[in-house]
Amino acid sequence: MNAWEVNFDGLVGLTHHYAGLSFGNEASTRHRFQVSNPRQAAKQGLLKMKALADAGFPQAVIPPHERPFIPVLRQLGFSGSDEQVLEKVARQAPHWLSSVSSASPMWVANAATIAPSADTLDGKVHLTVANLNNKFHRSLEAHVTESLLKAIFNDEEKFSVHSALPQVALLGDEGAANHNRLGGHYGEPGMQLFVYGREEGNDTRPSRYPARQTREASEAVARLNQVNPQQVIFAQQNPDVIDQGVFHNDVIAVSNRQVLFCHQQAFARQSQLLANLRARVNGFMAIEVPATQVSVSDAVSTYLFNSQLLSRDDGSMMLVLPQECREHAGVWGYLNELLAADNPISELKVFDLRESMANGGGPACLRLRVVLTEEERRAVNPAVMMNDTLFNALNDWVDRYYRDRLTAADLADPQLLREGREALDVLSQLLNLGSVYPFQREGGGNG
C-alpha cells in the first residue's frame, strides 16, 4: 500500500530560553544564561517546515506547551494566585522557575515513538508518549503531549495513542530520538531499530553522562505499539559516545528507508548490528562515517547526524542539515564527498536553526516522523497540515505574541504568563485542537 512519511515539527514556545537544564547535552550547557530570541527561534522552525512542504515533503505542526507550567510549581509547595506563585518561586528557588518554563517540548522527536500500520499486529498507527524521565523539565511534558497527539490523531479507528510509561528510571524512555525504521517503500513492513543506553544487570554503560533510554523501556514501547515481534531489533548505543555528548541516538545516526547514515562509533557491537540489518532488510545500505574523517566531537558540535534524510519520489534522498555543518570545513568536505559517492543522497539542504541548536536541538530533534497511508493522512486533523495559509497565519501569530529577547529573569514576569496563555488559546482555535491545555480546562483565565 502507498504511504508517505509526514514530518510533524514542533513549534518553538514563547518561553524559549537558555538555562543549561540538560546535563549530557553539551550545547545546552555551553549556552547557559545567554539571551534568547523566541520570535526568531519560532520563525527559523517555521521556515524549515514551509521550505520542506514547498519541496513536496508532507509537513505538519505540533504546538508548544503551556509555560511557565504553574500546576507543577503548586505541586512543589508554592501557593497563592498564579502571580504570587511566580513571585515566590523567582525569589526562593529560581531554578524551578526555569525548569517549568522550558520550551523543550519543541523537540518533538522526544514526544513519542511511532509504529506505522504496516508494522503493527492490529493494522493501526500506534503512538506511545515518551516519559522523558531522565530530566525533570522534560518529564513534565507527557500529559500535554498525550492531549495534543489525541487532538491531532483523533480517529480512534486508525490511531492508538498510548500514555507514557511509569515515571521511574528503570523505564526511562526518550521517544523517537532513539528509534529508527528501515525497509523498502514506506507502506511495506519495516524493521524497527530501538536503541537504548543501559539495561538492568548490564555493566556496559556510560560513566560521565547519563544513559537516558533503557532497554526495558524500549521493549515496553514495542509491546504497546503492537509491533510485530519479527520486525524488531534492540541495539545498545556505544556508551563511549554518550560520554562525549551523544545523549540521544539521533545525534549520531539517522535512517530512512533502506539507508542507515551513522558514525563509525555509534553503536556497541556495531559490525554485528549492521550484519543483522543486512540479513533482515532488503537492499540495506550503511553509510558509516569514519572517525578519521569526522570525529565524534565534530559530529556533536555540528549535529551532522541530527539531520533529516528525506526520500524523493525517484528514490533519491535529500539530507537536511543545520548551518553549523556548512561552517565546519571538515564536515562540509566530507558531505561533498558523500554527494559524489555511490549512494541515494543527491542533495544537501541547509537551514539556519541557531536558536534551537544553541540549546542542543537540530533539524531531527524538531520533527516527529509519522508514516501514513493516504487514508490515514486524511484522518489526521487537517488544521495542523502545513500550507501557505497556515504558514502565514502562524507567522502572524508569532509576530503578535512572541518576544524578541528573553532572559532567565523575564520568566518571573506575570505578563509573560498571560501572553503565553492568550497565545495558546488563539493557537488551539487556529489548529482546531479543542481545550488541550490545563489552563483552558481549569477555566483559569489569565489570573
UniProtKB/Swiss-Prot annotation:
Active site (record annotation): E174, H248, C365
Q: Can you say what this protein is called?
A: N-succinylarginine dihydrolase
Family that this chain belongs to? Belongs to the succinylarginine dihydrolase family.
Q: Name one GO biological process term.
A: arginine catabolic process to succinate
What this protein is reported to do is described as: Catalyzes the hydrolysis of N(2)-succinylarginine into N(2)-succinylornithine, ammonia and CO(2).
Catalysis: reaction(s)? N(2)-succinyl-L-arginine + 2 H2O + 2 H(+) = N(2)-succinyl-L-ornithine + 2 NH4(+) + CO2
Coiled-coil zones: none
| Gene field | astB
What's its EC?
3.5.3.23
Could you list this entry's UniProt keywords, alphabetically sorted: Arginine metabolism, Hydrolase
* EC class: hydrolase
Show the Pfam families listed in the entry.
AstB
Q: Which domain of life is it from?
A: Bacteria
Instruction: Tell me the GO molecular function terms.
Output: N-succinylarginine dihydrolase activity
Pathways per UniProt: Amino-acid degradation; L-arginine degradation via AST pathway; L-glutamate and succinate from L-arginine: step 2/5
Enumerate the residues binding substrate: 19-28, 110, 137-138, 212, 250, 359
Q: Which organism is it from?
A: Escherichia coli O8 (strain IAI1)
Keyword check for Hydrolase, yes or no. Answer: yes
InterPro entries per the UniProt record, alphabetical: AstB_sf, SuccinylArg_d-Hdrlase_AstB
What do we know about how this protein assembles, alone or with others?
A: Homodimer.
